[in-house]
């Protein structure tokens, strides 16, 4: 038995939304990993008594003032945390939309006796 076109369309939208959600979750996880890496770098800099650190820039190490690098890293961490919050809100909205779409699809499929 063939599925009606509107149900096929809803199913495609559902799958696209799932893919978008997966992308957002992956981006959020990448940012979280980068934050952990930057926080670990800041911890290591705190342990160092040197006022100079080395930062990778285009495949070479460049000497930099430790305080400047700490400030840069702190700003990046804060920026990434804001982005993570945004991704979390998007993730929550998409999860709700997926749940609603899933319920709608199940009802539609039951109505056509395909489920």
Swiss-Prot record:
Primary location group: cytoplasm
Pfam families tied to this protein: Prefoldin_2
Subcellular location: Cytoplasm
Keywords: Chaperone, Cytoplasm
Parts of the chain that traverse the membrane: none
InterPro entries reported for this sequence: PFD_beta-like, PfdB, Prefoldin
Single GO MF annotation: unfolded protein binding
Signal sequence interval, chain numbering: none
SUPFAM superfamilies, sorted: Prefoldin (SSF46579)
Example GO biological process: protein folding
GO CC terms: cytoplasm; prefoldin complex
Biological role: Molecular chaperone capable of stabilizing a range of proteins. Seems to fulfill an ATP-independent, HSP70-like function in archaeal de novo protein folding.
NCBIfam families: gimC_beta
Assembly and interaction partners: Heterohexamer of two alpha and four beta subunits.
Family to which this protein belongs: Belongs to the prefoldin subunit beta family.
HAMAP family to which the protein is assigned, alphabetical: PfdB
Stated name of the protein: Prefoldin subunit beta
The organism of origin for this protein: Methanococcus aeolicus (strain ATCC BAA-1280 / DSM 17508 / OCM 812 / Nankai-3)
């Amino acid at each position: 038995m063939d599925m009606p076109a509107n149900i096929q369309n809803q199913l495609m939208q559902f799958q696209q939304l799932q893919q978008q959600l997966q992308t957002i979750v992956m981006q959020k996880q990448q940012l979280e990993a980068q934050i952990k890496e930057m926080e670990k770098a800041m911890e290591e800099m705190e342990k160092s008594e040197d006022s100079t650190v080395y930062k990778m820039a285009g495949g070479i190490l460049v000497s930099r003032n430790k305080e400047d690098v700490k400030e840069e890293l702190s700003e990046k961490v804060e920026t990434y945390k804001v982005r993570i919050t945004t991704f979390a809100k998007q993730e929550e909205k998409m999860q709700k939309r997926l749940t609603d779409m899933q319920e709608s699809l199940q009802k539609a499929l039951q109505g056509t006796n395909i489920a």
